Regions:
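N-terminal beta1-alpha1-beta2 module of alpha/beta enzyme domains
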Residues: 1-66, 168, 273, 278, ...
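Hydrophobic faces of well-ordered beta-strands that scaffold small-molecule active sites
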Residues: 3-7, 33-35, 72-74, 102-106, ...
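Active-site mouth loops of central-metabolism enzymes
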Residues: 4-15, 75-85, 165-175, 237-251
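Active-site beta-loop-alpha junctions enriched in small/polar residues
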Residues: 8-10, 38-40, 77-79, 107-111, ...
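Short, acidic/polar
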Residues: 13-25, 90, 172-182, 246-260
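Acidic (Asp/Glu)-rich catalytic clusters
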Residues: 26-27, 60-68, 91, 95-101, ...
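An alpha-helical appendage that flanks or caps ligand/catalytic pockets
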Residues: 31, 123-159, 163, 193-295
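Internal, glycine-rich beta/alpha segment that forms the wall or movable "lid"
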Residues: 43-47, 83-186, 205-206, 213, ...
């Protein structure tokens, strides 16, 4: 099992800080770095939700040019917000910049107020997500390619450059069973958030059962969990966060991370919940020097 990081999206962490954190993560042996996606944060959400969201494709391009081996990924691109043909072009170009290190996690989105600001139908987001995944794969893998859908159709078009990877991985975000179904039906992996190891074990049993029903081979299917982390001097019981979060004293956090190892998942991606860059670097060094060698 590997450890990855999500780029911090908290106040006081700017894009240059994010770049430095990604470079440090690679130096310390972390295997992946992920960029989140929101375009606007409506006023009613400000204060309850971070509004520091650089464009994921631009920040990942910068990271790709300052690192050599760490995997990079979107987590998760909200597909209905963008023209999927343009997303396909951005991803394929980025895959060249990073020499084939890209994974594209996608999701249908959840913040209705953001859909409203962008003048995009909230109700149609699931159907669009499914169709847009098909558009991405059609453009990346076939040439010339034809596609006929409810939202996009094209005939005999050429799309270049193709990604470096012959099969650029598309993972599905989301915690609900419907998200699991979409990941099995249309994607190459599943990336939920915030589950404890016991909760994730239950979800994985459902995933395997559904995959068996659909006769989906899971040999090349990846599972990656995102969870919040902060190492403090206080017990996790006093953190004020849900008990599923990786928050508390160092030994408590380490034990929680190690508990996922029995599930045979690809990685745990760490979401830092402190706005202090130095604390984030200190935590990276602690994990890189003490926990990653054990994994």
């Amino acid at each position: 099992m590997d450890l990855g990081i999500a780029l911090p999206i908290l106040a006081n962490i700017d894009v240059k800080d994010q770049l430095q954190i990604a470079i440090k993560a690679e130096e310390l042996g972390f295997k992946s770095v992920w960029a989140s996606d929101h375009i606007v944060i409506p006023k009613e959400w400000k204060g309850r939700f971070s509004d520091i969201f650089p464009d994921p494709f631009i920040i990942l391009t910068a990271i790709s040019q300052n690192t050599k081996k760490i995997k990079i990924g979107t987590s998760a691109i909200i597909l209905p917000y963008r023209n999927p043909i343009i997303v396909a072009k951005m991803c394929s170009t980025l895959d060249h910049f990073c020499d084939g290190r890209l994974t594209c996690t996608v999701a249908p989105g959840w913040m209705k107020e953001e859909f409203d600001v962008l003048n995009i139908s909230y109700d149609g987001r699931i159907d669009k997500t499914v169709e847009y995944i098909k558009v991405l794969k059609s453009l990346w893998e076939d040439d010339p390619t034809d596609f006929k859908g409810n939202f996009y159709s094209f005939n005999d078009v050429s799309f270049q450059p193709k990604p470096i990877q012959k099969h650029l991985p598309v993972w599905m975000g989301g915690n609900h069973e419907k998200a699991i179904q979409r990941s099995i039906d249309y994607a190459d992996g599943w990336q939920p958030i915030w589950f404890s190891s016991d909760e994730l074990e239950i979800k994985m049993k459902y995933l395997k059962q559904y995959a068996e029903e659909k006769e989906r081979n899971l040999d090349n299917f990846s599972i990656s969990l995102r969870n919040r982390i902060r190492i403090t001097q206080k017990s996790d019981k006093n953190s004020g966060h849900p008990p599923t979060a990786l928050i508390g004293k160092k030994n408590e956090v380490y034990d929680k991370i190690l508990s996922y190892r029995r599930l045979d998942i690809k990685e745990v991606v760490l979401d830092f919940i402190t706005p202090d860059k130095e604390e984030i670097i200190e935590t990276l060094e602690m994990l890189g020097n003490e926990l990653i060698p054990e994994l």
